[in-house]
Amino acid sequence: MKNLQKLLLLILPFFTACTKDNGNGNTPPAETMYFPPTTGTSWDTKTIASLGWNQSAIQPLKDYLLQKNSKSFMILVNGRIVMEEYFDGHTATTTWPWNSAGKTLTTATTGIAQQEGLLNINTSVSTYLGAGWTSAPANKENLVTSRHLLTMTSGLNDANNLVTPANLTYLADAGTRWSYHNVFQKLMDVVAAASGQDFEMYFNTKLKNKLGMDGFWNNGLIFKIYHSNTRSMARFGILALNKGKWESEQVVNENFFTESINTSQSINPAYGYLWWLNGKSSFMLPGGQTVYPGTLVPNAPPDMYAAMGAEDQRIY
């Protein structure tokens, strides 16, 4: 791992409390999932000792995080905080960019808009944005659906990060080429057009506020990046762990969320709907067309799915 100047780690392990025979033939009940209140700062915790983890490994972990210029690091088990560490002046209230890990927020918001009947991800983007949102020939532009934007398979030129019609030229038919690119941002325009309101307003109402998150979108000329404190990132991680459900409300349709965290196309099996997937036979990375054999993170669980952004902004 590179010695990055900015590093935010959030780990939400996808495991439940272990069950063991207690000697009398009875198996302890599995621990329930915990959802922190959407207001205030209270949040249930668990101790390292209660989980039976190796407590002597904690200080070396903290030393490693400090060495790597980490800003914050959290471990949650079933929604409860096990570790919450801040470094280099960073605090629980410090706002920090998610970078591309925030793409998964766009995925969730798009899924909500679909479940409300406002859009269909298999419909041409041009249906919502009109003709000319790219410089591709009309028949090629019309091939691009929101699903292609979710899966990085638009076939549009990825050479320039600035998403303008002039830069969105035709390279390949939609669905035939995987390439990591900022064109996913057009999903925000699709949601805005379909809902009749600003994307951030729709996002705040349908997702952010329901989870008790803080934060805002910084819509720069090139990048559209979400900023929040680490606990807000953790809240979204809990939603992701529960396949789009928060307490009793299915905020994001479960079928859509399940699609999001499974292979979305055959070109890069390690990619879902803007989510990265472990345990696949091969993977591709941003910035190239090389196909690498093996799993994305060999020492991680094969069923892990992750929101991943530059400078190691992560939800695992």
Model-derived regions, located:
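Non-transmembrane alpha-helical segments in soluble domains
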Residues: K62, G111, S126, R147-T151, ...
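N-terminal leader/targeting segments and the immediately adjacent pre-domain N-terminus
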Residues: F15-T91, W96, Q114-L119, T151, ...
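Sec-dependent signal peptide recognition
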Residues: K2-L10
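Second-shell loop/turn segments in exported
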Residues: T47-A49, A92-P97, T134-P137, L171-R177, ...
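Penicillin-binding protein/beta-lactamase superfamily catalytic region
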Residues: G212-R314
